[in-house]
Amino acid sequence: MPPGIALVVFWLLVVTLGIAAVLVLGYRSLVWWLNAPDEPVVPLPNQSGAECVVLHFAEQFLDTVPKSEIPEWRRYRYTEVAEGKLVLTDELAEMMLLASLAELWQQGLLSFRVVAKDPDPFDPHSLDKEVLVSMGQMLPLTPLGRCFTVGYRIATRPVWLLREKRNEAVLEDLVEFALREVRRSLGWRKAKRNSAENLVRYVKEFLATTQPPSGAVANVKGALEALRAHDEALAEALQATIRYTLLALRRLEPDRDELGL
């Protein structure tokens, strides 16, 4: 047999075997996926959490600005937390997420560790640290506790050909998937493109039926202070990661300024 024909036959065999291997692996993965047990459904929230306290008593956690000082065309970036008082929606959502994580950490339900990572050279906002999250059991059914539970499952599950099942979730993934669950829970009629606005709306709807006690403010502030006292670098990494995740999600959302609105 001429060398050229032998080479063609050889490569045909290699390609055929490669296609067969991919088909077998794909078939096995499909069978596993079809026969995998359904994940238990996470019940709806039924108790207040730190995020509810921050939203309900926002003036005690964030600086407010008089409504009259903000031009009407810029007010879409703000949330009215009291009569004539506004806070930036992104800052409010950031504090709600941070307070919820601090409360769950104080209760021993979440643990964190910070690891170094290479920042993205093409992203000026990219971080050089990564926060990994461990969760031992389902979190309390607060609005964010429920969404964190769903987000943790998604962030740690195996992805075919990409990764095995994880024992820890990357905080960026956890927050992103939790905010996706917030949007899904709101439904397409109520959900907006802005993830921070969706979170505020989601918790505000819960607060319409369940009000946190006024004494809860001290508990939430105590959890935040305890986290900073335990490890200030960790607290800063948590806040920076939450801020970066909200920023990254906002890049995917249309900006009213860019649209001329």
Regions found by a protein language model. Name each.
Residues 177, 181-261:
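Short hydrophobic helical membrane-anchoring segments positioned at the boundary
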Residues 13-23:
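Core hydrophobic alpha-helical transmembrane segments of single-pass membrane proteins
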Residues 1-15:
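Feature marks short, highly hydrophobic, charge-poor N-terminal signal-anchor/signal peptide-like helices
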Residues 23-199, 254-257:
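Short, amphipathic alpha-helical interface elements at domain boundaries
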